[in-house]
């Protein structure tokens, strides 16, 4: 991360801030809080007036979470820079994945937004409702699967980043036990746990992965508690699929290793940090805005990864040996040019059942519905949502 909106250097401060905000992807501060860029706000007439395109973003967490929402807001700023004078942007942070999301999104439309981004899975139904009543507005829903005549979906292949940091984890572990602090049991998160494990096993077949579910996207105290439980259970390298830096900070305190997730988190645990699996939403956001400005916007479902420069592993630690970095570079190149597939069979679940045959590669439809742990992941998978 080049610039931080909120820089927090100790978990104690971060946890206190989180408690004050009371926000997560499940129950952030009621109603959310609004912010706008210097280029302009969403204030305006109920219908989009002639002039710059008004682009509004609904965020599930705080822009200072150092992870998921920070990455989206960084991309929003990139849109402003790319289309200076042609667009104005605004955002509302801490918008719950609940009925209140509909109110916030309707308000964005009422204030003249011509393009609305909803940045979490739980906005799907509220966005569909608003889209049905605001046919003049284009809607973009992150991580969803339903579309409408004026609503399309987009996502990033975060499992590619998970696999790549798994390669590092498999080469760095001394105990052969890895840990993942997971948010909620939806296919996106299960994919990432499995990909992390497969990446680690590509370097060290003896590796096993233990998982703690916190059932929140952003809850630093719970994330830290889960991380400590994994460390106490023998894990010496941690990954997360949550939104704060608490997991990495916990690894730092314990003298163990961890990774940044969604954004570059190396400053939060400089000794523990091995690398960060990051998302760059700016290529897609720029495309979406350009589509609207050019009049070429159409309904489609987009899932971008390393190939499209949407996923990367950055800030690789000097502690990672050269041969391991070379292997990581090889995997990244293979993902970019299509010569390597993470989900090429045989893929076996934790019960020994072959779920992807040796001569097959899992389809995107298969990955979108994944509801099992691969061999090597310990524990029972909670009911997928």
Q: What name fits each language-model region?
A:
Residues 18-20:
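Bacterial Sec-type N-terminal signal peptides, specifically the leucine/valine-rich hydrophobic h-region
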Residues 6, 29-31:
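Short amphipathic alpha-helical "recognition" segments used for binding
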Residues 13-16, 34:
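Repetitive helical segments and hydrophobic/amphipathic motifs
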Residues 31, 39-385:
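A residue-level marker of the well-folded mature domains of exported/periplasmic proteins
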Residues 23-27:
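Bacterial signal peptide processing site
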Residues 1-12:
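Bacterial N-terminal signal peptides that target proteins for export
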